């Protein structure tokens, strides 16, 4: 009888063998536990309807209501949308059974939403209702494009390429950006006193804002790793201590709004070695 040799879990992990779409078996030694949020929906059309409905409510209806009926500051409205964008990653990861469906959803949204915003910018109601800070408009179009392409890239790499066991890392990276960047902007605007002066730093970024980003990004990473990725508390703490300074540093030196892309990607990449080591050591 000829016996086929099997690679050890550690060898399979370090050799970069891709995971298949079904949930990883015990022999594949995934770096993260499978997504704990139950079985995903199998009908992609229903998933898309829920996702786009969420965007319409949280990114359009709620901000419009805040602007029209409350004295909410414009920057607070913007950051409410920012956090809502970030939270949508849980819908992308939880509603779709296959990575390519989750990848297609944000790309289709860009194809549909980008020209709609472009046309709306020509109407006076756009400036009156939306908190667009750019002189000629286009901030919401650029935000839509950057956020959705960032999600598509993260899904393609950390779900499509590396396999479904890496999927929770996408949420961890996006939460670091979503809550960290929002805190940095609001704290920097209202409490910032010490401006960061450097030729590579764009805009009025402050030490107080950067400190807030470190704190909020660390908290977001810790909670997401512990609750969503189901990691041990000490692994979650190490991830928070590692990822938060990386995210804050990248945010300081990112220009023209590209922190939406650079912060989640750098956070995810920074956590990969830690997750590989923790799995190899059996944490």
List PLM regions with ranges.
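Short, Lys/Arg-enriched N-terminal segments with co-localized hydrophobic residues
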Residues: 25-40
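Alpha-helical transmembrane segments
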Residues: 54-56
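Polybasic, lysine-rich low-complexity intrinsically disordered segments
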Residues: 7-8
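Leucine-biased recognition of intrinsically disordered, low-complexity hydrophobic segments
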Residues: 13-14, 32
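Interhelical loop and helix-boundary elements at the membrane-water interface
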Residues: 42-47, 61-104, 114-221, 226-227, ...
């Amino acid at each position: 009888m000829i016996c086929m040799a099997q690679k050890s879990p550690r060898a399979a992990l370090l050799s970069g063998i891709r995971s298949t779409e079904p949930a990883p078996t015990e022999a594949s030694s995934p770096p993260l536990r499978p997504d704990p949020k139950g079985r995903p929906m199998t009908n992609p059309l229903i998933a898309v309807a829920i996702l786009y409905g969420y965007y319409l409510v949280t990114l359009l209806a709620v901000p419009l209501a805040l602007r029209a009926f409350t004295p909410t500051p414009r920057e607070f409205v913007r950051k409410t949308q920012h956090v809502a964008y970030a939270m949508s990653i849980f819908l992308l990861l939880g509603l779709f059974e296959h990575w390519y469906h989750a990848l297609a959803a944000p790309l289709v949204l860009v194809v549909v939403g980008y020209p709609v915003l472009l046309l709306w910018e020509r109407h006076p109601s756009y400036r009156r209702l939306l908190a667009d800070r750019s002189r000629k408009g286009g901030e919401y179009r650029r935000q839509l494009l950057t956020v959705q392409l960032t999600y598509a890239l993260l899904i393609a790499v950390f779900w499509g390429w590396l396999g479904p066991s890496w999927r929770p890392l996408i949420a961890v990276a996006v939460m670091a950006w979503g809550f960290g960047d929002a805190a940095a902007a609001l704290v920097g605007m209202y409490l910032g006193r010490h401006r960061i002066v450097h030729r590579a730093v764009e805009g009025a970024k402050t030490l107080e804002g950067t400190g807030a980003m470190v704190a909020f990004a660390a908290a977001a990473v810790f909670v997401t790793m512990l609750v969503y990725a189901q990691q041990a508390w000490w692994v979650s703490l190490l991830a928070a201590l590692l990822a938060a300074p990386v995210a804050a540093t990248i945010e300081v030196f990112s220009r023209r709004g590209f922190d939406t892309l650079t912060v989640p990607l750098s956070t995810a990449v920074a956590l990969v070695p830690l997750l590989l080591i923790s799995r190899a050591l059996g944490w």
